[in-house]
Amino acid sequence: MIYEGKAITVKALESGIVELKFDLKGESVNKFNRLTLNELRQAVDAIKADASVKGVIVSSGKDVFIVGADITEFVDNFKLPEAELVAGNLEANRIFSDFEDLEVPTVAAINGIALGGGLEMCLAADYRIMSSSAKIGLPEVKLGIYPGFGGTVRLPRLIGSDNAIEWIAAGKENRAEDALKVGAVDAVVAPELLQAGALDLIKRAISGELDHKAKRQPKLEKLKLNAIEQMMAFETAKGFVAGQAGPNYPAPVEAIKTIQKAANFGRDKALEVEAAGFAKLARTSVAESLIGLFLNDQELKRKAKAHDEIAHDVKQAAVLGAGIMGGGIAYQSAVKGTPILMKDIREEAIQLGLNEASKLLGKRVEKGRLTPAKMAEALNAIRPTLSYGDFGNVDIVVEAVVENPKVKQAVLAEVEGQVKEDAILASNTSTISINLLAKALKRPENFVGMHFFNPVHMMPLVEVIRGEKSSEVAVATTVAYAKKMGKNPIVVNDCPGFLVNRVLFPYFGGFAKLVSAGVDFVRIDKVMEKFGWPMGPAYLMDVVGIDTGHHGRDVMAEGFPDRMKDDRRSAVDALYEANRLGQKNGKGFYAYETDKRGKPKKVADASVLDVLKPVIFEQREVSDEDIINWMMVPLCLETVRCLEDGIVETAAEADMGLVYGIGFPPFRGGALRYIDSIGVAEFVALADKYADLGPLYHATAKLREMAKNGQRFFN
């Protein structure tokens, strides 16, 4: 054994060939934490000092290669002064460069996944051989940063600037055949042949059949582009990527600028350019928010996994109520491998549900994400029925009938008599109390809420609602089923609107106040879209449905009359009474035409102004900043109340619920991280500034206490 650590070993294989193996003890995956980096330094030095070494194979002792840097450790570094951060990055990069500069040839044998620093380690090797089932990529832009271990330097010099820009700016994982096509790897083999293939490559390099020094040389030199080629490649790419990423996500464009700045330098000087740009990005609020989201997502996954121990396995599911929603749920279950019964009382609803599932599956086939055989398999896993005949073997039933408590109670009571005693019943409701619905059941302990967001196939969140009598097994089984469907479940306690809608309606309340104050709804939409929302509140209300919003507002007003009840008529009342229901009937705040792809296209409609005129009570001067605060303060305060009331257990879950459920701007991190970014004391002062607008703008006593004590939601 040449070197032995807790994350890395270096041992002799044969004829002067050694294997540098990553195998982090006590972890299921390899990652670059401080321990691994320190051991890599020692391992490289040990190889360098051993004259018997003729070649090095880099491998992994786990099912994946290396998943990247351990962000939980490195995030603290991002708060260091910029100069210290640059120095730390350059020190880490010296390790990779020293490995790259070894006198002997090196081969990286990539199994599983090599992401971020994992791929950057491979790029420092002379040759890369990849398992056909492996994937590689540089996903750092998704965290608001860019590759910092030489990725912006080595990748463009290996595969060309155009390909490298595409890989780095998109941040996606790339399959083996795509990696081979662009030259990111030198060979692709079946997983079982990876070790033999790596040995063959290294032997050919040792024998001189392959010239490893010549292979290495382009990575050490400047980019092979003349001035005109550089200008065309980089300026075009910056414009295109800026358009794709938008102004709130600077990392992809900064990555291109860094590649451009370093293009005329050799490796070492280029790495200095990379480190300087990386340090600037790492200290931005966008990086802080996106890294916070990543850590929150990890916490969500841990919490969801904790339910696995007591969850029952769902082998057969059922959905009550077909149509678009039922068809979407059936599709999601079937495509992820759980067969599902789809029941309705009307044949036409069944057909609508089947058409929806078939359409969604067909789109996946068109995009190459599903084979026709797999589509047929998924369709066969959806069994339409007008009766309860096959419900005896069902493990979970998702009720998705009309949003009416009496109808839901009747349907739930009926199905309870048709399923086995330990079957879970879950209501897909957006606003109706789970405790209220449970009153109709003989076994309320087997009942929970399971709130899917529309469209089901696109929205990642599922709220699993725990009622007063819901058992932990019922909650755990529903969480496990949601995960199996490919969703991100968050467990919340019962209250009107649960988490997401309870928080969304105060946001709509702020919008209603703005319209009543004479502010143009088109202007409000533009301001909030610029703030980072995927669509403004008027457009969102049209998409949700004015009737749905009207009903939801009434439910919330009944549940929280102290702050959500407003006796004045609002814009939503006016549109609802005028039968302008949004996209569903072609007119809401906007009018809708069908575009070439058959999708609704928003257009201005002057006639809506006459409809809104009676609900405009004043003409108030309101700045863009005021518009943001009228909307965001009540949303943030209601999120705080949900946390204080125990509706949601952690700040991480609250923020992720809003990002996944209503499209809260990810680069702002969620409502509670947004408060942190302003400062809790400053946010309380902001709320006080708008306190005359009503109780929705009144900070809670606990929040005031946090402000007084200098506390944050995230530390």
UniProtKB/Swiss-Prot annotation:
An example Gene Ontology CC term for this record: fatty acid beta-oxidation multienzyme complex
Residues at which NAD(+) binds: 325, 344, 401-403, 408, 430, 454
UniProt-recorded Gene Ontology molecular function terms: 3-hydroxybutyryl-CoA epimerase activity; delta(3)-delta(2)-enoyl-CoA isomerase activity; enoyl-CoA hydratase activity; long-chain-3-hydroxyacyl-CoA dehydrogenase activity; NAD+ binding
SUPFAM superfamilies, alphabetized: 6-phosphogluconate dehydrogenase C-terminal domain-like, ClpP/crotonase, NAD(P)-binding Rossmann-fold domains
Record-listed E.C. numbers: 4.2.1.17, 5.1.2.3, 5.3.3.8, 1.1.1.35
Chain positions recorded as substrate binding sites: 297, 501, 660
Gene3D superfamilies with a match to the protein in the record: 1.10.1040.50, 2-enoyl-CoA Hydratase, Chain A, domain 1 (3.90.226.10), NAD(P)-binding Rossmann-like Domain (3.40.50.720)
Pathway listed: Lipid metabolism; fatty acid beta-oxidation
Catalytic activity: a (3S)-3-hydroxyacyl-CoA + NAD(+) = a 3-oxoacyl-CoA + NADH + H(+); a (3S)-3-hydroxyacyl-CoA = a (2E)-enoyl-CoA + H2O; a 4-saturated-(3S)-3-hydroxyacyl-CoA = a (3E)-enoyl-CoA + H2O; (3S)-3-hydroxybutanoyl-CoA = (3R)-3-hydroxybutanoyl-CoA
One GO BP annotation of this record: fatty acid beta-oxidation
Site, as annotated: Important for catalytic activity: 120, 140
Domain of life where this protein originates: Bacteria
Active site (UniProt): 451 (for 3-hydroxyacyl-coa dehydrogenase activity)
Coiled coil: none
Keyword annotations of the record: Fatty acid metabolism, Isomerase, Lipid degradation, Lipid metabolism, Lyase, Multifunctional enzyme, NAD, Oxidoreductase
3-hydroxyacyl-CoA dehydrogenase: annotated segments: 312-715
Pfam families in alphabetical order: 3HCDH, 3HCDH_N, ECH_1
Region entry Enoyl-CoA hydratase/isomerase, spans: 1-190
Listed PROSITE patterns: 3HCDH, ENOYL_COA_HYDRATASE
Function according to Swiss-Prot or TrEMBL: Involved in the aerobic and anaerobic degradation of long-chain fatty acids via beta-oxidation cycle. Catalyzes the formation of 3-oxoacyl-CoA from enoyl-CoA via L-3-hydroxyacyl-CoA. It can also use D-3-hydroxyacyl-CoA and cis-3-enoyl-CoA as substrate.
Assembly notes: Heterotetramer of two alpha chains (FadB) and two beta chains (FadA).
Similarity comment: In the N-terminal section; belongs to the enoyl-CoA hydratase/isomerase family. In the C-terminal section; belongs to the 3-hydroxyacyl-CoA dehydrogenase family.
Name recorded for this polypeptide: Fatty acid oxidation complex subunit alpha
Organism: Pseudomonas entomophila (strain L48)
Gene behind the chain: fadB
